[in-house]
């Protein structure tokens, strides 16, 4: 097929309004963003989410009493909220994972998390293959996983490495150093460098990824983000009066940490990354990369089963419209 040539119009036609047409339709429909938080109890997961969206959206599912027993398994808790900013409506599914990493034996503590992520892919695929497919498919696929690293100042725990390697295969992972104000600036810089080296050593493939069609601006932006990962963050829903004005902050042994001050922590960089530059890309990457890998494996498996059944003279497997897909086939 020949490359079409560019033609100059003699008069105004009006198809340039397609962008505003799309914009009106998208605003009318609203948007959806599904965020998972993974980290041990006391990491400040709920507080960071509430700080990110400047609203109380999540209650802590962790242990409120230090004498309370630890959970024996990793649980999954989903909170759904709708937030509005100007004319834009955003439906949030906030997925907490209480119990993760809290046991004495954390062997396979990641399995409920991986299963949940794959189950959402499976559910979406069932709807997609349904002969009476919905006009707008309900999307519960996890778009972003915030992975909380304890501010030890040393290195990643073996369990962190094991879980990160598995998570990055199925979801966009963004690591953060929780409660980073417990470290000095020098300790924080050294800790971040140590963790980055471990990411490379263990071949942990973190978001963002450079796509084949990324332009120079996107590539440079992604490179700048990678230089910040893992984000050293502090969350706070409390207002503290400093110099006569309220700020979102935390009081620590060195003074007051202003959450929104780039010199104090990297919360602002994380918020800008998640909300202002990469929100749509997180959603699209989930669909075009992680979900597409899952979909390909599932449909290839069904095709092989169908081919084998034909050769054996058995009835071919039915493409599912009900919970018939099994996530166990996805590796």
Swiss-Prot record:
One Gene Ontology term from the biological process aspect of the record: mitotic cytokinesis
Annotated spans, G4 motif: 178-181
Disulphide-bonded residues: none
InterPro entries, sorted: G_SEPTIN_dom, P-loop_NTPase, Septin
Region (G3 motif): 96-99
Region (Disordered) location: 311-331
Subcellular location: Cytoplasm, Cell cortex; Forespore membrane
Any GO CC annotation of this UniProt entry: cell division site
Keywords tagged on the record: Cell cycle, Cell division, Cytoplasm, GTP-binding, Lipid-binding, Membrane, Mitosis, Nucleotide-binding
Binding-site list for GTP: 39-46, 73, 99, 179-187, 235, 250
Septin-type G domain sequence ranges: 29-301
GO MF term set: GTP binding; GTPase activity; molecular adaptor activity; phosphatidylinositol-4-phosphate binding
Location of region: G1 motif: 39-46
Source domain of life: Eukaryota
The keyword Nucleotide-binding is annotated on this UniProt entry: yes
Annotated membrane topology: Peripheral membrane protein
Assembly with partners or alone: Component of the septin complex composed of two copies of each spn1, spn2, spn3 and spn4. Component of the sporulation-specific septin complex composed of at least spn2, spn5, spn6 and spn7.
PANTHER family per record: SEPTIN (PTHR18884)
Entry function: Plays a role in the cell cycle. Involved in a late stage of septum formation leading to the separation of the daughter cells. Involved in the correct orientation of forespore membrane extension during sporulation. Binds phosphatidylinositol 4-phosphate.
Family, per entry: Belongs to the TRAFAC class TrmE-Era-EngA-EngB-Septin-like GTPase superfamily. Septin GTPase family.
Protein name: Septin homolog spn2
Provenance organism: Schizosaccharomyces pombe (strain 972 / ATCC 24843) (Fission yeast)
Gene name tied to this protein: spn2
